[in-house]
Amino acid sequence: MSPARITDFSPGKPRKALLCIHGAGCSAAIFRVQISKLRVALKNEFEFVYATAPFSSSPGPGVLPVFQGMGPYYTWFQKHHDAVTNTTTPTVGDRVAAVIGPVQKTVQDWSITNPQAPIVGIVAFSEGALVATLLLHQQQMGKLPWFPKMSIAVLICCFYSDEARDYMRAEAQDDDDKLIINVPTLHLHGRQDFALQGSRQMVETHYLPQNADVLEFQGKHNFPNRPSDVQETVKRFQQLYQKVKMSGSFV
């Protein structure tokens, strides 16, 4: 049985919505808690819509002990040794295809039941931030006609890999210009995060400098916790949001 869809929706208030993509070994319910400070700060502007990854997994980095007993936990990509069937190892393309289904269902269910609150942006963490980047890149390559036009994205502590980079480069037919995603983004990087170098590399490889605002905070693989970092995160998002609104990118 698929997990129930989780949203933060207030009836009677037509707004815009943000698609939320959790990390590996996590869940929509846990991610809702992880970004609670951001949700509270943006509650007058946005609804939050949560997608759930397709594969069961053990708890991911930073999930325990805080979220002990809050399973089941899910991951977006199966490991090679878990996904082998008849000695056939799935390609990156196969694994990207596997994440599309649950995201598409989340988007379409929301669009049908809440047409007054279109999805216009993304909030994604860790492996979910990689999923978001892959989806944005696929859309920019003329694929995913069902995927909403994203005007803004917040990517938190992205887990990035050479394998993902090589896949996107192959999709772009080695045209570096086609590797660049033209969406205004806020990137949150923990200075003590094990994934910091990959997060930086993803920004350099896939996002326009003039559209990518990078905030490095004192922390590990988590959403910012210190009040000053939370305030700066909200301030940067609101500045980016106002810039996007002024450009007329929101419908």
UniProtKB/Swiss-Prot annotation:
What pathway is this protein a component of? Polyketide biosynthesis
Please tell me one Gene Ontology term that the record gives under cellular component. cytoplasm
This protein's record includes keyword Hydrolase:
yes
Looking up InterPro entries in the UniProt record yields: AB_hydrolase_fold, FSH-like_dom, LovG
Q: Which reaction does it catalyse?
A: dihydro-ML-236C-[compactin nonaketide synthase] + H2O = holo-[compactin nonaketide synthase] + dihydro-ML-236C carboxylate + H(+)
Q: What class of enzyme is it?
A: hydrolase
Family, per entry: Belongs to the LovG family.
In Swiss-Prot or TrEMBL terms, this protein is called Esterase mlcF
